[in-house]
Amino acid sequence: VFSGKIHKMKLNLALAQINTKLGDVEANLAKHLDYIKQAKSEKTDLLVFPELSLTGYVLQDLVASAAHKPVDDDPIFKHLLNASKDIDLVVGFVDEDSRHRFFIASAYLSGGKTIHVHHKVYLPTYGLFDEGRFFAWGDRVRAFDTRFGRMGMLICEDFWHASPPYLLWLDGADIMIFSSASPGRGLNDKEKLESARWVERVTKAYASMFTSFVAHSNRVGYEDGLHFWGGATVFDPNGEEIAHGPYNEEAITYSQLDLNQLRRTRARLPLLRDERTNLTVAELQRILQK
């Protein structure tokens, strides 16, 4: 757990929207290291990769062989942990617990250490999606401390539900990092895919309602008939868009977060101060007892 004080009020954030090779973790690692090198040359503090960025998405029977642990002696993570001595990283991978359950996971790496791991808590198993057949459900939503302040991570379907971002907000997260492997759906006569419009609307809304920074990194490319659209975004605590990546192509989207904006916004709009958490808990208990 990070215990040092925050030493920067500006955070240079980069979002990497990459294509991945399904099941080829070593090839995907090489791409990560290349993007890390690019981001370092731009003085980036934190580089965020998409959901399952080390493995690809439609893994199915490749899940077990693609799993890795975010520890020093792991053949993949040792390189990423070493890279994190110079730049903080969020990477997507398949995690495995001591009883051989497999999770869709994001790891926050900093200073050569794993600071936090989030296991995806909502696994879509409908329509195009089949995650519940192959993965275990995460059971925690926790914020964590970094050298830039307190953050939280969610993965795709997690933020299609209102409760995980709300829990992160109450747990002290001022910067929310969302990562996705979001396939395109709802193409019509408008410029944007409906899935892209929906994600951008909801991330903007979370930033506004929770007076927090919200960043979203989504992968690109095609995999097993699915098309991933990219379109990275960053919103400030006023809900204003401060960065937007291109659609349908690999890119790094750079932004600078002025962390003083948290104070300015919350002094004017004290939604966090006035949040009645005890009321929420009491009403949830009543509803659950029905």
Where are the regions that the model predicts?
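Active-site catalytic loop in hydrolytic enzyme cores
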Residues: 70-75, 97-201, 268-271
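CN hydrolase (nitrilase-like) catalytic-core segments centered on the catalytic cysteine
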Residues: 72-90, 156, 160-252
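Short beta-strand scaffold segments in enzyme catalytic cores
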Residues: 91-93, 104-108, 142, 232-234, ...
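Short, Lys/Arg-enriched N-terminal segments with co-localized hydrophobic residues
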Residues: 1-8
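Extreme N-terminal starter segment of soluble prokaryotic enzymes
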Residues: 9-15
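Short amphipathic alpha-helices and their capping/turn segments at secondary-structure boundaries
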Residues: 30-44, 163-172
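A short C-terminal boundary segment appended to hydrolase-like catalytic domains
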Residues: 263-290
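Cys-nucleophile CN-hydrolase/nitrilase-fold catalytic domain and related Cys-dependent amidase chemistry
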Residues: 25, 34-121, 182-205, 209-212
